[in-house]
Design a protein with these regions (language model features):
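Active-site hotspot residues in diverse enzymes, especially metal/ion-binding acidic/histidine motifs
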Residues: 1-244
């Protein structure tokens, strides 16, 4: 596994640009599957997380309403909050450090795109954020602060809206970096450009819709993820709206 040399802020947050995350994600994707660059296809993201990043994957219900899609555990705990649907009650689970826990609602065929992006996202936390979250242990009244990060389904930071290293709290920046990493691994920058090289380039709505479909079909991602990847790579305008 390629191990990046990262610079960190005092809080333990990586100081890294979106472009450098793209470069790192692509390098890791190619290191894992060297054919992924010049023959664009869906990366086996589950195997990438488990075998390449060496992060075991478990499925548990993280809430009763799917508000949390994934959790990365940084320190072994007996107290990860989970929901037991059979008993309709909350409980705690033992989870080892370095484990990715995916909400059970994503373990369904019609949730494949969301599952794939969530796996990449949690992998991003594993690559970038152990130092940050472990540094926060004991920093609040909550006993579980820093032991794990629970990623909400309603968090959205996309495109260039939060480029660079400004405007975000550390917690928000961690989510943005994990999102960018997931996009970079699932849809490597060079592979996207190779994929779209054969079509006349313009920024019309028709071109955007067609490019989104091609990216979605080729990399097995949602059209929404494809749209924000195009925006993040500045292939469409920052203010462009989803065409559906």
């Amino acid at each position: 596994m390629f191990k990046p040399k990262l610079k960190y802020s005092r809080s333990g947050m990586p100081v890294i640009s979106n472009e450098d995350i793209d470069t790192l994600g692509e390098r890791m994707a190619v290191d894992f599957d060297y054919t992924s660059l010049f023959n664009p296809h869906p990366i086996d993201i589950e195997r990438f997380v488990e075998k390449y990043l060496k992060m075991p994957i478990e499925f548990m219900y993280l809430s009763h309403c799917s508000v949390y899609l994934g959790t990365t555990v940084f320190q072994t705990t007996d107290y990860l909050p989970v929901y037991i649907p059979e008993d309709k009650c909350a409980d705690y689970a033992h989870v080892e450090a370095g484990t990715v826990v995916i909400d059970g609602s994503l373990d369904k065929e019609d949730q494949e795109h969301r599952l794939r992006f969530t796996l990449g996202h949690e992998g991003g936390h594993g690559v970038f954020h152990p130092s940050y979250f472990l540094n926060t242990i004991g920093s609040s009244e909550r006993d579980d602060t820093g032991i794990y990060v629970r990623c909400r389904s309603d968090f959205k930071v996309s495109g260039r809206d939060f480029s660079g290293f400004r405007s975000l709290t550390d917690a928000e920046r961690a989510e943005q970096q994990a999102n960018r990493f997931s996009a970079a691994v699932l849809m490597p920058r060079s592979a996207v450009k190779i994929l779209l090289a054969g079509r006349p380039y313009n920024r019309t709505e028709g071109w955007i819709v067609s490019a989104m479909k091609q990216i979605s079909d080729t990399f097995n991602v949602s059209k929404e993820a494809a749209f924000y990847r195009l925006k993040g790579l500045e292939m469409i305008e920052e203010h462009a709206k989803m065409p559906f």
